[in-house]
């Protein structure tokens, strides 16, 4: 039986510490659950008063809009979306001036730099946290991707200069997303990032279109990704490329606050 309330701690010396807080309380949503009552019960179990490295997370299907009022009243915000693209979804045309090539081991420094740009931009939106060792752990993880026996990472180029990077986890590396996939086999689009001075040039679209072509030809039925919902770049971008929201991660960080915050107040604003 699935545990409704859970708590996990992430070691600070790990890449996982970049993707969220070190201490995470989770409430597992289930169909038909009494979410308002569960949220009330959960409040008494939470720890980490005013600790920014704690968070309370509830992941609900994006179409479950009835869950939103209770979550808002408890001070939660929708920060992350798990989105999905089904195979064969049409994509926008590729800009001709952007070239693309597979990344190699010789590109590891560039790949780390481009991934760090994404980490730093996404850190504004409540979940991602750059740590002192983030670059070191990204280097290890990206080296593993480059060592796979198939192409999984590509660079977008302006002239000969890399300005963007995308990599995917093919089905054999995407099993950890099993519960979120609506079709099989499924892959996970793990990273897309473009250098700040090259955003809006089409580099991201070229990389995405190429990755989708590779995945479709490989027979991948579903591609999943995470994106920051408040990010003004990623949200419109992914939906213009055929993705649709499937699950929304509602977050309160810190998990406990000495002040409840504006979103937790029930009073209506003064309309006079």
Model-derived features: positions:
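Acyl-donor-binding surface of acyltransferase catalytic domains
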Residues: 29-97, 247-255
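Conserved acetyl-CoA-binding loop-helix of GNAT-fold acetyltransferases
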Residues: 32-48, 191-194, 200-213, 217, ...
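A short beta-loop-alpha structural element at the N-terminal edge
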Residues: 99-114
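Conserved active-site alpha-helix within GNAT-family acetyltransferase domains
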Residues: 62-78, 205, 217-218, 228-247
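Conserved donor-binding loop and adjoining core beta-sheet/short helix segment
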Residues: 1-42, 163-185
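Conserved hydrophobic beta-strand within the GNAT/NAT acetyltransferase core sheet
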Residues: 56-59, 189, 223-227
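Conserved GNAT-fold acetyl-CoA-binding loop/helix
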Residues: 122-141
């Amino acid at each position: 039986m699935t545990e409704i309330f859970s708590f996990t701690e992430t070691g600070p010396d790990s890449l996982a510490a970049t993707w969220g807080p070190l201490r995470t309380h989770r409430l597992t949503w289930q169909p038909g659950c009494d979410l308002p009552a569960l949220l009330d019960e959960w409040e008494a179990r939470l720890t980490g008063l005013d600790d920014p490295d704690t968070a309370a997370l509830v992941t609900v299907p994006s179409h479950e809009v009835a869950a939103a009022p209770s979550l808002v009243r408890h001070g939660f915000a929708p920060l992350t979306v798990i989105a999905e693209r089904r195979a064969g979804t049409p994509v926008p045309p590729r800009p001709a001036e952007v070239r693309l090539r597979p990344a190699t081991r010789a590109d590891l420094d560039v790949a780390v730099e481009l991934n760090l740009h994404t980490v730093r931009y996404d850190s504004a939106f409540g979940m991602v946290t750059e740590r002192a060792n983030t670059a070191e752990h990204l280097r290890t993880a990206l080296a593993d991707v480059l060592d796979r026996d198939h192409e999984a990472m590509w660079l977008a180029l302006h002239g000969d200069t890399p300005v963007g990077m995308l990599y995917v986890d093919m089905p054999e590396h995407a099993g950890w997303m099993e519960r979120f996939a609506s079709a099989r086999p499924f892959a996970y689009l793990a990273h897309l990032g473009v250098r700040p001075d090259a955003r809006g040039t089409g580099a991201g679209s070229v990389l995405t279109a190429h990755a989708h072509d590779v995945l479709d030809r490989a027979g991948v039925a579903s591609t999943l990704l995470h994106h920051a919902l408040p990010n003004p770049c990623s949200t419109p971008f992914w939906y213009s490329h055929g993705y649709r929201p499937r699950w929304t991660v509602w977050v309160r960080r810190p998990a406990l606050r000495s002040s409840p915050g504006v979103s937790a107040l029930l009073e209506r604003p003064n309309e006079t």
